Amino acid sequence: IASILTNEKHLPLVYAMAFGMPGIPCIYYGSEWGAKGNKSDGDPALRPCFEKPEENELTEYIGKLAEAKKGSKALNYGAFRSVVLTNKQCIFERKTEGERVLVAINADSEPYTAHFDAGCGMAVDLITGKKHDFGGGSQLPPYSAFFWCCEA
């Protein structure tokens, strides 16, 4: 997917979406490093051999997303509900009997303040472990993603 994006800053957001949406995220060999391929050179060019892993910030970020999904019943089994949807931002809810996670993504180069009823006052971001206060709107920095687990 790194080969077809026109803005490389969207790549981590694509993975946040994949891990936040219902289903099992698929990461093809090399994608965890942001490797690019050229399909016009045929299928083998899309499956290069790597001598050693090329770990980077994207690799670390995908690892955090995987841990967040692994530890969350809502992200694995929860119902889906769209909360906020614009051309460049989305917030959706994943919910089970005992857990609610709000997945928030800002794909814009500008910050975005989302005003919506979160149904809770505080949350913990499952990606970073940082607390989030929903009071006064939720600030989404440019090119950012959050998995806010609402406190009961």
Each model region followed by its residue ranges:
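Active-site and adjacent substrate-binding regions of carbohydrate-active enzymes
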Residues: 1-152
